[in-house]
Amino acid sequence: MLLKKILKQTMKELKRQLRKQIREEKKLHTADVLKEHSSILLKQIEEHQRFIAARTILMYHSLSDEVQTHAFVEKWHTSKKILLPIVQGDILILRHYKGKEFMQVGAFGIEEPVGNEFTDYDEIELGIIPGIAFDRQGNRLGRGKGYYDKLLPLLHTYNIGICYRFQALEEIPAEPFDRSMDEVWTEEGRWNKINEK
């Protein structure tokens, strides 16, 4: 029992240090460079067969330290059903993005869509998922709140993690409840090993 507790604390500390390291690394890149890298990466996603085929997609409305998705979401919301996650308590709920004019500032100062909760999870064909870091096995390091670890098991969707190249690592600490991605992409291309579903 004591060993399990020590291992859990060690894992928590490793993840905390890794998040700090990635934040420091991000400071070495200008906003213009990150914007350009976001565009390059999202162009690859647009050309991905899973994206082309999908009609309903789980996306995210980016924070300043994430691959920038605002223009991408706006571009595609009229031809595909784009769902955005909303923080509600300690979970994420989903809402349909219908345009900039239907957004409001919610938890953590994040803009989020207004409207009803989307619950038809079987309709979602693709998830485009952010992360602090990803590794070659598709493991994801989030912000530490477990939001996506709770949401993703409810969905039966193919998930693509997206991040900047400096966030793509050989290996990150992962626990059994951490949800891995089917694919991981950076501005330089696919990062993780090929293991198609």
Predicted regions and their residues:
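Surface-exposed, charge/polar-rich loops and edge strands
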Residues: L3, M11-E13, K27-L28, P113, ...
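Short, solvent-exposed loop/turn segments at secondary-structure junctions
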Residues: S64, G89, A133-F134, Q167
